[in-house]
Amino acid sequence: NSAFNYISPTYLVDLPSKGVFYPGGHPLNGKTTVELREMTAKEEDILFNKSFLERGIVLEKLLQSLFVDKSIDPASLLVIDKNALLFAARINGYGPEYPIKANCPACLSQFDSVVDLNTLLKIREKEKKDGVILLSNGLLSVTLPVTKWVVVIKPLSGADQDNLQKILETKKKNNIDQNSLIENIRSYVVSINGVIDGTSIYEAITNMPARDSKLLRNVYSDCFPNITTTSQVVCTVCRETADLEVPFTISFFWSK
């Protein structure tokens, strides 16, 4: 036996989704918490892995290593849960202090500030709306006011979000109109009047009356739980107070 045996402690992280929006058979269906291991030098190696960084999968690999339950696929995590888990891992591994460079909207100066991650993450609970039905598989069904189409929507997973980003980047690279609003709606629409064909759904969204489109976006925004990462900072130059959206990137784990 080595004199340096060390068993990493574990801790529980609350899921903002409360496991409600995962389909039956998913390891997080109905689960309100996930157990993570404490970060070690092994996880730091993952954060600096050049191959993972180039492929854009470093955060998924980090969570995969930290999960006690290895049956959980990080790519299948809802974005809200994924971000909450990464926040918890960052605080557990490096503490809650997060140094940032902020731009003052009043005097336009750039200044250094420190954000307390314990107070940064704010979870907005899902709302109940008339006419919106929670289906047994974690999806939502809503009837649109103008067309009367019955639309089924899902909360985005990390894989869905990555796929949306790739679609928009490919369109931009090929000088194709990005239609970002349409693509964004398309990313969370599962079916319209029972039709699941992607081309048909895209066409329907493109021609959807503005009133229907607005309601659909509001239902997605309000009826699924969401996370905000806004912090109030004070400019060190002019002393003006501003609300700043803290960017969530890999540098989140690299700050000194």
Predicted regions: what they are:
Residues 1-256:
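Long C-terminal interaction/binding lobes of large macromolecular proteins
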